[in-house]
Amino acid sequence: MLEPNADHRAAVAQAAGVAASRITLTVMLDEWAGADARRRAVADTVCALATGCASLAAAIAEGPLAGDLARTLSSGEAGEGQKALDVISNDIVIGALKAAPVAAVASEENDAPVLLDPTAPLLVAIDPLDGSSNIDTDISVGTIFAVFPRPEGADASEPSAFLQNGRDMLAAGYVIYGPHTAMMLTLGAGTWHFALDRAGLFRLVDAEVKVKEGAAEFAINMSNYHHWDVPVRDYVDDCLAGKKGPRERDFNMRWVASMVADAHRIFQRGGIYLYPGDGRKGYTHGRLRLLYEAFPVAFLMEQASGSATDGRGAILDLSATGLHQRVPFIFGSRDEVARVSRYHLEPNGHGERSPLFARRGLFI
């Protein structure tokens, strides 16, 4: 094996020094929380999640050396195959939250809330491993979470405790496990970007994340084109028409089948993500979960000057009606999200059903 030369060693040392000089997540949270009891509880919960996600990053990095992490063990709550790594991820994050002031956890991997400390002030809704269909292909996966207050007098073991409005969230974020492990976090005053260092600490990359406008990228699963409602088709058709179409510019399409990966790209480059409801059985109201997928990503987007909608209004204006409720979900650059909303809301003869909700309409 070739020995690194002096220039290489110097570059590595410099990079390590730059990383070490960056403020840590723990310090940021301590400064934010101060002496406020609720903020302290939120900070402790986010720190616990960060610790769990750092452990999960190490487990994911083992890949096939740790066995067949992509093997299907059972059918989860959603009726989808529950992978071995789904179960491992769930155990890790819930285990980490046992040290936090959390009353209960609503996880994609559990039918009912997992009770931790019934008297604690907070609730956590979480997707421990978003994009698990990508495990065996070594494509980025992630963890998505939302922190809510426990309503006064609420039984945290009951799903009803979690059925809150999106504006009730106290914090939200995701961790993406890719070429490097990164976290996006909001506490309601902007969106912060952190990266995990080799010592297992999340260090600040950007405290003022902003979603760019004017990007010419959209993310949608084009294989479902013939199932979409007319407004969704029209939006995509206009993008695909390129410079000769009404948009007068060329667009690129992206689709990772891991919402965290698509969201992270949008935070870096702008653009839009669409997962509408469609005409297939089980897809009428979309596929993504409101509590632990749409709510937290929408919170992050809005705090970074982006936008998120179900096609009729802001995602964060919704109130959850079920622990695993599904919702059509569009998010990204504010200008593009507004355009898609106009395609659905303006009376221009687009289709016969309610926005994004397949042929039956939302309330039928």
Curated annotation (Swiss-Prot):
Top-tier EC class: hydrolase
PROSITE patterns for the chain: FBPASE (PS00124)
EC number annotated for this UniProt entry: 3.1.3.11
GO MF terms held by the record: fructose 1,6-bisphosphate 1-phosphatase activity; magnesium ion binding
Major localization class: cytoplasm
GO CC annotations, alphabetized: cytosol
The entry's keywords: Carbohydrate metabolism, Cytoplasm, Hydrolase, Magnesium, Metal-binding
Compartment(s) of residence: Cytoplasm
Family as reported in the entry's similarity comment: Belongs to the FBPase class 1 family.
Stated name of the protein: Fructose-1,6-bisphosphatase class 1
